[in-house]
């Protein structure tokens, strides 16, 4: 009976899609073609979900999800994005018989905060596997906010995440990923290009971010030293997966908090996360480690601030391992006036040669992203 009901529902959806796309002058042959094309589209979506390539999760935003301005904390959104990605990638990597594994977050591509999310709204997070290599999974995530009083929905975030499957028997062993079926050959080729690009950038970033932020006494306003900040956090069980390693989303939220402190100290106004450049996870963080999350201003444009955030882990209960770099990223913040509109920020004053070099590198990233946005903007009539 359930199979019959499901078949009838599938037929009805296909019929409605087909008839909604017809024009009055179409003939029966056109009707048949449109109907069966719609049926194939519906079945493709259903099969895609059945195979486990999509997952959707949602929850209402509570007061404890808010930042000081009253909107949903950017770190909370990043954490939800990572949770959805971890679910779908771990499920996929265990979809075939073999050694069991857990998917570990390796990298988050640039994430833009397109629209603020408010307390009381429902966050809908949808994740889809879009590419698999031999040892990694690409997951694309979309975040929608819904006002349940008015029914209004809007897109707030888009992100791309990369995961690697680690064996439950030996977490240092990376397992092979079951391949996915692509609808078009072009999809696989485009995914392979994205994979090679992120792999190269991850290797370059790991060696570039080698220095540690050092505190300076009595710094001058608007300098790097004036606003640089750090948080020290002891990793506990609530921060970790069932296997004793820190959730990537926990690390990202702490990174966002430090970046927000740096931005607020620099401009002394309300600030919000505008975007996050690629977050690279260089190494795993175990339960019991003490992590130091350090942030420093690297560049300012007229209305935006770029903050570099570094995460260093110290295995205090393991004398055999030294302090190491666990993650790094660049966050972009904007300053808001009382009406919630972007306003100019104080210009950063780099003092040392390293600070001047980082400023020029940040300027290059800013101009590159600005040109990319302008290139995607459609000309107005």
Curated annotation (Swiss-Prot):
PTM sites of type N6-acetyllysine: 169, 199, 284
Amino acid composition bias (Basic and acidic residues), ranges on this chain: 354-364
GO terms of molecular function: carboxylic ester hydrolase activity; identical protein binding; long-chain fatty acyl-CoA hydrolase activity
Result for mutant: residue 67 to A: Dramatic reduction in catalytic activity
EC annotation from Swiss-Prot or TrEMBL: 3.1.2.2
Top-level taxon of origin: Eukaryota
Start and end residues of each stretch annotated as Disordered: 342-381
GO cellular component, as recorded: cytoplasm; cytosol; mitochondrial matrix; neuron projection; neuronal cell body
Catalytic residues as annotated in Swiss-Prot or TrEMBL: 67, 256
Tissue: Widely expressed with highest levels in brain. High levels also found in thymus, large intestine and testis. Negligible in muscle and adipose tissue. In the central and peripheral nervous systems, displays a predominantly neuronal localization with highest expression in cell bodies and neurites.
Pfam annotation, one family: 4HBT
Induction: Up-Regulated in activated macrophages.
Domain HotDog ACOT-type: 51-169, 225-339
Pathway connected to this protein: Lipid metabolism; fatty acid metabolism
Protein keywords: Acetylation, Cytoplasm, Fatty acid metabolism, Hydrolase, Lipid metabolism, Repeat, Serine esterase
Catalytic activity: hexadecanoyl-CoA + H2O = hexadecanoate + CoA + H(+); dodecanoyl-CoA + H2O = dodecanoate + CoA + H(+); tetradecanoyl-CoA + H2O = tetradecanoate + CoA + H(+); decanoyl-CoA + H2O = decanoate + CoA + H(+)
Subunit structure: Homohexamer.
Purpose of the protein: Catalyzes the hydrolysis of acyl-CoAs into free fatty acids and coenzyme A (CoASH), regulating their respective intracellular levels. Preferentially hydrolyzes palmitoyl-CoA, but has a broad specificity acting on other fatty acyl-CoAs with chain-lengths of C8-C18. May play an important physiological function in brain.
Protein name: Cytosolic acyl coenzyme A thioester hydrolase
Gene: Acot7
């Amino acid at each position: 009976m359930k199979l019959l009901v499901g078949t009838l529902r599938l037929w009805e959806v296909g019929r409605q899609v087909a008839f909604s796309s017809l024009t009055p002058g179409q003939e029966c042959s056109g009707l048949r073609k449109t109907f069966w094309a719609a049926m194939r589209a519906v079945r493709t979506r259903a099969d895609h979900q059945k195979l486990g390539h999509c997952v959707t999760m949602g929850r209402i935003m509570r007061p404890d999800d808010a930042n000081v301005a009253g909107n949903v904390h950017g770190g909370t959104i990043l954490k939800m994005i990572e949770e959805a990605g971890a679910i779908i990638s771990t499920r996929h990597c265990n979809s075939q018989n073999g050694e069991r594994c857990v998917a570990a977050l390796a990298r988050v591509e640039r994430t833009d905060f397109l629209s603020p999310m408010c307390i009381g709204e429902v966050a809908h997070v949808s994740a889809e596997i879009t590419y698999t290599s031999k040892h990694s999974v690409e997951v694309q995530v979309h975040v929608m906010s819904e006002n349940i009083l008015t029914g209004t929905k809007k897109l707030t975030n888009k992100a791309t995440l990369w995961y690697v499957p680690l064996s439950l028997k030996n977490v240092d062993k990376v397992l092979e990923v079951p391949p996915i079926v692509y609808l078009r050959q072009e999809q696989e080729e485009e995914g392979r290009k994205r994979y090679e690009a992120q792999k190269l950038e991850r290797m370059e970033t790991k060696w570039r971010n080698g220095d540690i932020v050092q505190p300076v006494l009595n710094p001058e306003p608007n300098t790097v030293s004036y606003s640089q900040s750090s948080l020290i956090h002891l990793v506990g069980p609530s921060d970790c997966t069932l296997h004793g390693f820190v959730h990537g989303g926990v690390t990202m939220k702490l990174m966002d908090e430090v970046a927000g402190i740096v931005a607020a100290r620099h401009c002394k106004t309300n600030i919000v996360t505008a975007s996050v450049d690629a977050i690279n996870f260089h190494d795993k963080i175990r339960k019991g480690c003490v992590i130091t999350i350090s942030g420093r201003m690297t560049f300012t444009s007229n209305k935006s601030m770029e903050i570099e955030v570094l995460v260093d882990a110290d295995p205090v209960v393991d004398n055999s391992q030294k302090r190491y770099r666990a993650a790094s990223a660049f966050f972009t913040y904007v300053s808001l006036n009382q009406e919630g509109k972007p306003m100019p920020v104080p210009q950063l004053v780099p003092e040392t040669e390293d600070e001047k070099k980082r400023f020029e590198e940040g300027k290059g990233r800013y101009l590159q992203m600005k040109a990319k946005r302008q290139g995607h903007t459609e000309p107005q009539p």
